[in-house]
Amino acid sequence: MSELASHDDAPAGGALVTALGRRSVVLVGMMGAGKSSIGRRLASRLNIPFVDADAEIEKAAGMSINEIFSAHGEPYFRAGEARVILRLLESGPQVLATGGGAFMSEDTREAIRAKGVSVWLRATLEVLSRRTKRRADRPLLKGDDPQSTLKRLIDERYATYAKADLTVDSRDVPHDAIVDEIVAGLRALPVLATPGGAP
């Protein structure tokens, strides 16, 4: 039995997908917030595809995010990231996990607003620091003091992340509990009160 079919919230999930129409659920937030892991579970719950924007960028470029940063720099990466997200937004409904800097682009935010519903997975510095220590593929954290870099990025980004349609705290609880909160929050959004989505 599928997770969608077996979960108590399955009927609401079906109604939510109907309300989404062609819109995507776009997860935004810092590296380490859980966008990919929670996104996969959310997509399974809703029975729609999960897409990781970073993976799609790597596929399009034929190199890893680290390699793109090293060879071309962050501005080049951000331009490619914006193009890939615009393309992906045309193929909803889906759950789309975006890179930490993607939502900082006003053009990308406008595209997400037009073609999706944004969900900020908000996490504390402590949680992010603990989670990102496990990963070596974070180009923005390659300096001598990743904790200070995380703090600076939080200070720079959180006011913009707060413009998302929905905010859910990412914390050390079972992922299904966070998925439950996302589903409940999406169901309550006025933007999803009427079915259809972007034409």
Model-found features: residue ranges?
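Hydrophobic positions on the alpha1 helix immediately C-terminal to the Walker A/P-loop
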Residues: 38
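Hydrophobic anchor at the beta1->P-loop junction of P-loop NTPases
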Residues: 27
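ATP-dependent small-molecule kinase phosphotransfer cores
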Residues: 49-113, 137-138, 160
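Conserved lysine of the Walker
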Residues: 35
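A glycine- and Lys/Arg-enriched "phosphate-lid" helix/loop adjacent to the NTP-binding pocket
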Residues: 114-159
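NTP-dependent small-molecule kinase module
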Residues: 1-20, 41, 45, 91, ...
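Walker A (P-loop) phosphate-binding loop of P-loop NTPases
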Residues: 32
